[in-house]
Each structure stands twice: as structure tokens, then as C-alpha cells.
């Protein structure tokens, strides 16, 4: 079952759990209402019972979050 997480701190706590082994980072290029392009980054973490997703529209926050992921977590970039 999939769940969407909106809080970054809660997402980082999920990545430190023992049952979480892999994370997927997907970067999409989208347009805002004014037609200006921006990067949307999706972080997907697979737990034992659920797939947790965090969506971030700020590229700076996304880079910091990628760096703060635990080193034991296997990260796939799409």
C-alpha cells in the first residue's frame, strides 16, 4: 500500500528504520502555472508493508535531502 509523506523529518525517520533497504529518487521537469519550468523530485522508500513517497518542488531542498540519506541505504536514481 502506498502512502504520501509531507514532512521531511518524518521521511528521514522512515529511512533509518531497519526494514527499509532501498530508496528511489526520481526527478521530473514540470511547468508551473506561468509556464516556467521547475524540477519536481520524488523520493520513494520501500518499507516492509508500504511504499512511502515524498514530493519536493524545491531543487535546493532536494539536494540537501539526498545528502542526508543514511549511507547504509541503497539509493537508485531515475
Curated annotation (Swiss-Prot):
Coiled coil: none annotated. One of its GO terms (molecular function) is structural constituent of ribosome. GO terms for cellular component: cytoplasm; cytosol; cytosolic large ribosomal subunit. GO terms for biological process: cytoplasmic translation; protein-RNA complex assembly. InterPro entries: Ribosomal_eL38, Ribosomal_eL38_sf. The keyword Transmembrane helix does not apply. It is found in: Cytoplasm. Keywords: Cytoplasm, Ribonucleoprotein, Ribosomal protein. The keyword Ribonucleoprotein applies. PANTHER family: 60S RIBOSOMAL PROTEIN L38, LARGE RIBOSOMAL SUBUNIT PROTEIN EL38. Belongs to the eukaryotic ribosomal protein eL38 family. Component of the ribosome, a large ribonucleoprotein complex responsible for the synthesis of proteins in the cell. The small ribosomal subunit (SSU) binds messenger RNAs (mRNAs) and translates the encoded message by selecting cognate aminoacyl-transfer RNA (tRNA) molecules. The large subunit (LSU) contains the ribosomal catalytic site termed the peptidyl transferase center (PTC), which catalyzes the formation of peptide bonds, thereby polymerizing the amino acids delivered by tRNAs into a polypeptide chain. Component of the large ribosomal subunit (LSU). Mature yeast ribosomes consist of a small (40S) and a large (60S) subunit. The 40S small subunit contains 1 molecule of ribosomal RNA (18S rRNA) and 33 different proteins (encoded by 57 genes). The large 60S subunit contains 3 rRNA molecules (25S, 5.8S and 5S rRNA) and 46 different proteins (encoded by 81 genes). Present with 50200 molecules/cell in log phase SD medium. This is Large ribosomal subunit protein eL38.
Amino acid at each position: 500500500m502506498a502512502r504520501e509523506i509531507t514532512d521531511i523529518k518524518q521521511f528521514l525517520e522512515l529511512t533509518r528504520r531497519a526494514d527499509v533497504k532501498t530508496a528511489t529518487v526520481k526527478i521530473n521537469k514540470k511547468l508551473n502555472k506561468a509556464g516556467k519550468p521547475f524540477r519536481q523530485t520524488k523520493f520513494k522508500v520501500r518499507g516492509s508493508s508500504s511504499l512511502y513517497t515524498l514530493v519536493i518542488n524545491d531543487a535546493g531542498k532536494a539536494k540537501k535531502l539526498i545528502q542526508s540519506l543514511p549511507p547504509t541505504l541503497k539509493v537508485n536514481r531515475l
